[in-house]
UniProtKB/Swiss-Prot annotation:
The record marks 84 as: Increases the nucleophilicity of the active site Cys. Catalytic subunit of the ferredoxin-thioredoxin reductase (FTR), which catalyzes the two-electron reduction of thioredoxins by the electrons provided by reduced ferredoxin. GO terms for cellular component: chloroplast. One of its GO terms (molecular function) is electron transfer activity. Binds 1 [4Fe-4S] cluster. Disulfide bonds join 55-85. The gene is ftrB. It holds the Pfam family FeThRed_B. The lineage of its organism: Eukaryota, Cryptophyceae, Pyrenomonadales, Geminigeraceae, Guillardia. It comes from the Eukaryota. [4Fe-4S] cluster binds at residues 53, 72, 74, 83. Its cofactor is [4Fe-4S] cluster. Its main location: plastid. This is Ferredoxin-thioredoxin reductase, catalytic chain. The active site is at residue 55.
Length: 102
């Protein structure tokens, strides 16, 4: 991964690594997907103050941030280990890599 990123990107990367280890999930075997998702989370963190899931469409992003449902880690991820963005994958997922670090 490229090393010159914003503070928010670095924070999201650290969060993702910690969360993957804690939940025993793995990053996608195509790390370009992981990078794009982290960039989207960092952008939303900068713009809205929270890491809103970048892989969904929202009519009102500020309203979604306030509801917290789709803030990463989203409710489906926390409850069922279902990550729509493919950032956190269970080891039985065909797209899961073997890494929990970036």
């Amino acid at each position: 991964m490229i090393e010159s990123y914003s503070d928010s990107f670095v924070a999201m990367k650290k969060f993702a690594e910690t969360y993957a280890k804690r939940t025993n999930t793995f990053f996608c075997n195509d790390l370009s997907i992981t990078q794009i998702v982290l960039e989207g989370l960092a952008k939303h963190k900068d713009e809205y103050g929270a890491p809103l899931c970048p892989c969904r469409h929202y009519d009102d992003k500020s309203e979604e941030v306030a509801s917290t449902y789709w803030n990463c880690p989203c409710v489906p991820m926390r409850e069922r280990k279902e990550c729509h963005c493919m950032l956190f994958l269970t080891k039985d997922n065909e797209f899961a890599g073997s890494s929990q670090t970036l």
